[in-house]
């Protein structure tokens, strides 16, 4: 089992032939944001980006940093395992145990991108749900408003298992919409405007005029 971070890139999936250009910008921003934590790799796959770090990587800190990167709609810490149902079942119990121990209700969601996998999505949900109920007797199933959602994604090369998805900053990757200058005053309006522009992919150059003692002399007059 290898632990990775799954990035959901949101509205980038709506882009056409230039979608890969936006994904490349987002992956470059991710690598730059995590550079001080070690060498991380980014791999685009089926509307997601798989972020892998070195064995001793601090994934808690990496997750906190990525939540502030524009272009990321959501992310999850996930266990990457081989596409074997027994391995998937055991990993679901072991990897998500901290979440399940603290919860009262749960739900299983499965996505089977690899159609050659012997079980379909509803069957995967039944198998995983049954395994969890056999190990965590205090839990109940709630498909409408669960405390924890256990996700199983069967991809082409491996399967990913993760809990609730964390909401990211959203928007577009920084630098994808050119550059602009932001006049930063002493009020709240300019920082808010800057944040909204940055969320749409604008790379900002902040400008601030510090003019004392001239402004102070005008006030005294």
Task: For the regions a language model picked out, list residue spans one by one.
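RNA-binding accessory domains that recognize and position tRNA/RNA substrates
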Residues: 1-181, 191-217
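Conserved G/P- and acidic residue-centered "switch" motifs that form tight phosphate/ATP-binding loops
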Residues: 187
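Conserved small/polar residues in nucleotide/adenosyl-binding loops
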Residues: 219-221
């Amino acid at each position: 089992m290898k632990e990775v971070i799954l990035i959901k890139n949101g509205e980038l999936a709506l882009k056409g032939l230039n979608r890969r250009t936006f994904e490349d910008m987002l992956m470059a921003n991710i690598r730059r944001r995590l550079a001080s934590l070690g060498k991380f790799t980014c791999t685009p796959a089926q509307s997601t980006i798989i972020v892998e770090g070195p064995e001793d990587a601090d994934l808690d800190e990496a997750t906190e940093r990525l939540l502030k990167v524009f272009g990321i709609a959501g992310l999850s810490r996930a266990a990457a395992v081989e596409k074997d149902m027994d391995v998937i079942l055991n990993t679901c119990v072991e990897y998500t145990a901290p979440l399940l121990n603290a919860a009262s209700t749960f739900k299983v969601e499965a996505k089977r991108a690899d159609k050659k996998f012997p079980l379909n999505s509803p069957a995967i949900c039944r198998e995983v749900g049954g395994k969890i109920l056999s190990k965590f007797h205090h839990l109940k199933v709630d498909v409408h408003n669960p405390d924890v959602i256990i996700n199983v994604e069967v991809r082409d090369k491996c399967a990913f298992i993760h809990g609730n998805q964390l909401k990211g900053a959203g928007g577009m990757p920084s630098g994808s919409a050119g550059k602009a200058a932001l006049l930063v005053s002493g009020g709240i309006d300019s920082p808010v405007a800057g944040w909204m522009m940055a969320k749409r992919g604008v790379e900002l150059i902040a400008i601030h005029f510090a003019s004392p003692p001239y402004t102070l002399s005008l006030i005294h007059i």
